[in-house]
Design a protein with these regions (language model features):
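Conserved ABC ATPase "signature" region
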Residues: 119-138, 248
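C-terminal boundary and immediately downstream tail of ABC-type ATPase nucleotide-binding domains
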Residues: 134, 235-264
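ABC ATPase NBD coupling module
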Residues: 60-61, 72-85, 103, 111, ...
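Conserved ABC ATPase signature
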Residues: 142-147, 151
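A short, proline-enriched helix->beta-strand linker immediately N-terminal to the Walker B motif
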Residues: 162-166
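A short, surface-exposed alpha-helical micro-motif characterized by mixed small hydrophobic
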Residues: 210-212
Length: 264
């Protein structure tokens, strides 16, 4: 694709431990299109989080990589914080417990945008308001342990976009939250991606969650890319039995008709 933000070609990752090597990703060919919302779907151990970490340059030291990731939109490997933001699954461990919320967000803006501390702190307050945190001026001076799980994840999102990146990677950002807060966080991410013109890579095990907002879906299983395509096509006409089973597992009495029913 000529408008690819990132292009993976024959990309593989294995983890070395105790003299053995276990494959996490195997020969992945995948383009991430600039401006799209791409959902990476898979069960635990599918390699989806390894993909997110690889794109962010955050693989651990015992990772053995082959193949290639190219960045046509940048011409160079993107700079963490500046060119891409990363939202982790566990907001609690992502935040520094001894720094205030405002300090943590302002630090990103100060470092990457060259703002003075006063200006950066003002941007932190604006971002807290932007991610729909009530009383942002009070939360600015709060510490992570004083916030709810949903509020902490909003703070992490604010920090991830503080330097105005064009690429946002969200690795299972809702899995530790209740259903209502999950929907709120997804809605917030949708809004931010649209308003700021970002590309979103959203990693999740929940294909039903992704079905509501993704432009494209890529399904992973056992380190392999099972199928990828426009969300409507994957959801209504899955090519692989595994994808069909993921869809079927979410169709029950408590789930609105997802997918194939919508095409009927």
């Amino acid at each position: 694709m000529s408008n690819a933000l990132a292009r993976l070609t024959g990309f593989s990752v294995a983890y070395r431990a105790d003299g053995t090597s276990g494959v996490s990703l195997e020969a992945i060919d995948l383009d991430i299109v600039a401006g799209e919302r791409l959902a990476i779907i898979g069960e635990s151990g599918s390699g989806k989080s390894t993909l997110a970490l690889a794109l962010a340059g955050l693989l651990p030291a015992n990772a053995v990589v082959s193949g290639r990731i190219a960045w046509p939109a940048y011409g160079h490997a993107p700079l963490p914080g500046r060119d891409y933001g990363f939202v982790f699954q566990d907001a609690g461990s992502s935040l520094n417990p001894v720094l205030s919320v405002g300090e943590q967000i302002a630090e990103v803006a100060q470092h990457h945008l060259g703002m003075g501390w006063f200006e950066a702190f003002g941007r932190a307050e604006e971002l807290l308001e932007r991610v729909r945190i009530p009383q942002p001026e009070a939360v600015l001076r709060a510490y992570p342990h004083q916030l709810s799980g949903g509020q902490r994840q909003r703070v992490c999102i604010a920090s991830a976009i503080a330097a105005r990146p064009k690429f946002l990677i969200a690795d299972e950002p809702t899995s530790a939250l209740d259903v209502v807060v999950q929907a709120e966080i997804v809605s917030l991410l949708e809004e931010l991606v649209r308003d700021y013109g970002m590309t979103l890579l959203f990693v999740t095990h929940d294909i039903a969650l992704a079905s509501g907002f993704a432009d494209r879906i890529a399904v992973f299983r056992g380190g392999r890319l099972v199928e990828a395509g426009p969300a409507d096509d994957v959801l209504s006409r899955p090519k692989d039995a595994y994808t069909a089973s993921l869809i079927a597992s979410h169709i029950d009495l408590s789930t609105p008709p997802l997918i194939a029913e919508n095409a009927a």
